């Protein structure tokens, strides 16, 4: 996964996260179905909006994986006294930090586009996810479809579904919470295999 390369991209990322994501975040976290005994990871935590929602469900443990140093500083300041572990590693390799089959839920909001190669990330998610664990992707494919394909690698749902199905049971739906800017694809992956 890549961090924003320029100040302009970083600024755009922050504004998009703040204004367009709140309804998507609320809906996504609700759909994830977090319970008190869950270990939850958010990949690409950005400014921490989704972490606030996750925190409201009072899971046993929360991990925030964020490769941007700038966003990690924001997270460290915002959640300094919370039960949230902030990780700066790329999500493709969390082996030194998260043991096998210890995570119940993984949330990724507007992150799938940057996971390259996608299979490497899916293999790592499979490793850390408990049997019957769930991954929830919230994606807006239409707005990013015309962006630079060197950066935005996974912008077509139909093209990424075969990779997702190699590792997990997959369900997806187009969600319209009422505002045009909050429409998104909800992709839920379930780890039905024990290994």
Where are these regions (language model features)?
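Glycine-centered, small-residue-biased loops immediately flanking beta-strands
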Residues: 38, 133
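Conserved SAM-binding loop and adjacent beta-strand
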Residues: 10-26
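Core SAM-dependent methyltransferase catalytic element
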Residues: 176-195
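A short SAM/SAH-binding and catalytic strip from SAM-dependent methyltransferases
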Residues: 104-118
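Conserved class I S-adenosyl-L-methionine
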Residues: 136-163
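Class I SAM-dependent methyltransferase SAM/SAH-binding core
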Residues: 41, 47-93
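A short acidic, Gly/Pro-enriched loop at the edge of an enzyme's catalytic core
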Residues: 96-106
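A short glycine-rich, Lys/Arg-flanked "PGG" loop and its adjoining helix->strand segment in the class I
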Residues: 119-131
